[in-house]
Amino acid sequence: MKVVLYMAMTVNGYIAKENGDTPWSDAVWNGYYNFVKKRGNIILGKRTYELMKDANEFEKLNFPTTVVVSNSPDKQGGDKTIFVPSPKEAVRVVKEKGFSEAIVGGGSKLNAGFLKEGLLDEIYLDIDPLLFGKGIKLFDETDTEAKLELLAANNLSKNTLRLHYKVLK
């Protein structure tokens, strides 16, 4: 099972504004929708899940199998939404559902949890030409470090770049 973190971010490393707003370009949104639709699953933190649910994002993703890592995992989500207490449990559920890749879609705390537990195999970053003065970082405060190997760098559009890294273990 390959675990892949997929995030959009600004040039200065933010994945959202402080209020959770994500004003990404069409190139980033289209890249994100296609990436998740092709794989059929996504693992989210509770806040990111709520923001996406409120914005009707799951319809645009063809209602993928969604695993939400939450401190209250007993919450019911629906046919394709499963709540779990930890990143390791999220990966187990995705694998049990028959997927070969688990897609981690944020937020910052969840990303840090996957990094800290050594679960990430690859990272895709779509870099939009934006700067946020303040915001939510790619990884919440963590003392965990990782070395990466660049596998590919491609343009999604004239101004937007996709970086693909392997996490070295």
Regions found by a protein language model. Name each.
Residues 1-169:
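Enzymes that bind and transform nitrogen-containing heteroaromatic metabolites
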